[in-house]
Amino acid sequence: MSKRKVAIIGSGNIGTDLMIKILRHGQHLEMAVMVGIDPQSDGLARARRMGVATTHEGVIGLMNMPEFADIDIVFDATSAGAHVKNDAALREAKPDIRLIDLTPAAIGPYCVPVVNLEENVDQLNVNMVTCGGQATIPMVAAVSRVARVHYAEIIASIASKSAGPGTRANIDEFTETTSRAIEVVGGAAKGKAIIVLNPAEPPLMMRDTVYVLSDEASQDDIEASINEMAEAVQAYVPGYRLKQRVQFEVIPQDKPVNLPGVGQFSGLKTAVWLEVEGAAHYLSAYAGNLDIMTSSALATAEKMAQSLARKAGEAA
């Protein structure tokens, strides 16, 4: 099967790590162009050293390159505002081009590979939510397939050192996009997301806490569902793991808790603690937050490439 050529817009931490993953591990993908806006960026310099074509003139520079004619999939690792403009420009030049959005822009549907990749594989634009969303939404979905989830809250703690200018510029969009995706993909009636930039030295690994309030159900069934989901995520993010056993608390009907936007709740509270260790392809091992984004985007693109190849075969 011939590989599909891809371009990455954004030569920062995420874009560079993703490029290295594609060059080393791409099964159905061929790294064609790295796009940036800073001619002095380390990402563009590294791409050139690795034999990848580059431009420092942004999406316009990409569209003016001869390589653009053969590109089927574009990853956007810029910012939410920039992605809206990039999508419009690329769509006008190539209506059928596939975009994988690693910003919180969310023009297309949210995609969390282990939960809903199959139903989104033929979309022209998919959004990879956020690092916190990729880590925690599978856990919410794991509870949702056993019991009705009324509320889910996630706290993502990431090393301050791993948060580049793009991440910092998108903090508000991070919380909004993650909260919405907890509902749309995770299956919660109400979702809430909090991000913490931890300045500790040496930097700590990404840690995530997930609280899920659901109807009462078998605790064994919920724990089994969570463990099964964690294994599925590990297939494309090897450093993803449960930090400790799942914990439960029954909230009795005569002592309900009051949830903003939900009302009074009684039922089962499930608490999950996660840790994500990065693969250290370009970034340090503590930057699991960036690794889970690039790994999820890579898994999505691989499936898209297979789908495009099948369609090309059917049309031939």
From Swiss-Prot:
Organism expressing this protein natively: Escherichia coli O81 (strain ED1a)
Top-level class of the enzyme under EC nomenclature: oxidoreductase
GO biological process per UniProt: 3-phenylpropionate catabolic process
Catalytic residues (positions): C131 (acyl-thioester intermediate)
ATP-binding among keywords: no
Pfam annotation, one family: Semialdhyde_dh
Official protein name in the record: Acetaldehyde dehydrogenase
GO MF annotations in UniProt: acetaldehyde dehydrogenase (acetylating) activity; NAD binding
Positions with a binding annotation for NAD(+): S11, G12, N13, I14, S162, A163, G164, P165, G166, T167, R168, A169, N170, N289
SMART domains: Semialdhyde_dh
Similarity comment text for this entry: Belongs to the acetaldehyde dehydrogenase family.
Assembly and binders: Interacts with MhpE.
Function: Catalyzes the conversion of acetaldehyde to acetyl-CoA, using NAD(+) and coenzyme A. Is the final enzyme in the meta-cleavage pathway for the degradation of aromatic compounds.
